[in-house]
A protein has these predicted regions:
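Bacterial N-terminal signal peptides
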Residues: 2-11
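Peri-catalytic and regulatory segments of divalent metal-dependent proteins
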Residues: 18-168
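Sec/Tat signal peptide C-region and signal peptidase I cleavage site
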Residues: 12-16
Length: 168
């Protein structure tokens, strides 16, 4: 509990002043995420719900979004204690529901109270959300919610709906 409140105190301090970000060409190796391999993996899957064009667009959009997040300066690369803690909670949740999907949490430098998940197991947790969380149980609830989005392929479902709607 002390670690949790100390972490939240640091998170609140992290959001107290505006940040100015610049593109980061020097992403630490542990964060390297090969967007090309993600794109190939996603386009190689045969999905009866998606036409080949929509599937390629979907794969490209996921890969592009993550690449943009990594290079934007919005991802914390130097806060390993908090990242390890949140990833350990995600691992416990995934193990408890017997999920075979691998998850990775990225901490986002933003005051927004938000979190999001991609179907490929990437979860973005915004520091503004962590600053508002009252205890570990609340954080676990948010993480479980995001894991459910990834498991149920909600990103893909939204992309399909958007693709169909934009054709009208």
């Amino acid at each position: 509990a002390i670690l949790f409140y100390f972490t939240l105190l640091l998170a609140v301090g992290a959001t107290a002043q505006p940040h100015y970000y610049e593109l980061r060409p020097d992403i630490p190796p542990v964060y390297n995420y090969n967007s090309d391999s993600l794109y190939k993996k996603l386009t190689g899957l045969k999905d009866i719900e998606l036409s080949e064009k929509v599937q390629m667009d979907y794969a490209a959009s996921l890969a592009y979004y993550h690449e943009r997040m990594l290079h934007s300066g919005y991802i914390y690369f130097e806060w390993s204690e908090l990242e390890d803690y949140v990833n350990s909670l995600v691992k416990k949740i995934a193990t408890s529901i017997q999920s075979e999907k691998e998850f990775k949490v990225y901490l986002v430098r933003s005051e927004d109270v938000n979190a999001s998940a991609q179907d490929n197991g990437i979860i973005y947790i915004y520091i503004g959300l962590l600053a508002e969380i009252k205890d570990e149980a609340a954080l676990i609830s948010v993480l479980a919610h995001e894991i459910s989005h990834a498991i149920h392929s909600d990103t893909k479902k939204n992309f399909i709906a958007y693709s169909r709607q934009s054709k009208r």
